[in-house]
Amino acid sequence: MGELTFTEWERKNEVASQRIQQLLRVLSKSKMLHVLYALVTKGENLRFSEIKKSSFTDSTTLTRRLTELEDIAIISKNEVSTNPPVVEYQLTESFSTIKPILEDLLHYGLEDANNE
């Protein structure tokens, strides 16, 4: 595999830039970090009500945030065929690439809270 041509480099740079911008748009939405924090700290296969309780988010906002996270493949939704039907959410492998960034944000917040 040789060096990239300038055009190839530009194309890859543009794709990376678009992905970063998309992620930042999603993460900056109201209650998004609360939802992700709930998913990270509460474990796998969380139900809507568990995420809602842990994230202090109303149903409408939570539905939007979960859909947005699903759209960018950060979470997946699993519909369990039971009566009544159950929907569970879990983080995907894609999340592992941004998990350290969110952990750093959490540590920053905790450090700031400890200084007050």
Predicted regions mapped to residue ranges:
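N-terminal leader segment of winged-helix/HTH proteins
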Residues: 1-27
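Canonical helix-turn-helix DNA-binding module
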Residues: 48-77, 84
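Short, solvent-exposed amphipathic helices
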Residues: 97-115
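A cross-family signal for key residues in well-ordered alpha-helices
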Residues: 34-37, 70, 106
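Generic leucine side-chain signal with a strong bias for well-ordered alpha-helical environments
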Residues: 39, 62, 66-69, 91, ...
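Basic, amphipathic "hinge/linker" alpha-helix immediately C-terminal to the N-terminal HTH DNA-binding motif
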Residues: 81-102
